[in-house]
Amino acid sequence: MERGPVAHQSISRRTLLGGTAVLGLSALASTGARAAGPMTVGVIYVGPKDDYGYNQAHAKGASALKGLPGVEVVEEENVRETNDVQKTMESMINMDGASLLLPTSFGYFDPHVLIEARKNPTVQCRHCGGLWTEANPKNAGSYFGYIAQGQYLNGIVAAHATKSKKLGFVAAKPIPQVLNNINGFLLGARSVDPSITCQVIFTGEWSLAVKEA
């Protein structure tokens, strides 16, 4: 079940959580109450769902979930990597009855996902980032795709397209996963021509369309 405009979501999830969300929390918090109806999955994005990139890829996955029987999906866009994500997670649990949360941005995990996982042991949290360790709560998992393999193929294509032998890569932040993607891209390009070079620019933000352009 997709929510309305982002502005309305911000009001309902963050501003009103301390008030109206208190009503009926005990019923929504019980595992039995969730099991009686459809499974509700909450998906949280750090930027807009139509960014033609990371967030949109997750949004397409959420759209596929909506087609599954017995599954409802609630979503919120433009949630910063601050305490805002904790408020959004809590409202999805307490207001929407979510039993599975998919916070998709790297900076959500520590401390925000870990805090909410400990506070809500019956709710499963699956974070995109590959940051899980055995010390984390049992209901807090982390996953990550083999994106570098796709970037390797992108590098091959770029190598065949370039005439200058100079490539560019616009990235967000120099975290290990991003650096792995950059390396995959350059290795793919150099499998075609070892003399190719790549200039990398970091924007410093996960979703900053103007600077990315």
List each language-model region with its residue ranges:
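Short beta-strand elements at the ligand-binding edges of bilobed clamshell
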Residues: E134-A159, F169-P174
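Periplasmic-binding protein-like
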Residues: G97-F106, Q124-C128
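Extracytoplasmic "Venus flytrap"
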Residues: T40-G61, L65-L68, V74-V85, F106, ...
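Extracellular/periplasmic Venus flytrap/periplasmic-binding protein
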Residues: Q177-A213
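N-terminal secretory signal peptides
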Residues: M1-I11, T15-S30
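Structural motif
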Residues: V73-M92, G204-A213
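Flexible loop/hinge segments that line or gate small-molecule binding clefts
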Residues: R118-F144
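C-terminal segment of N-terminal export signals and the immediately downstream linker at the start
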Residues: S30-V43
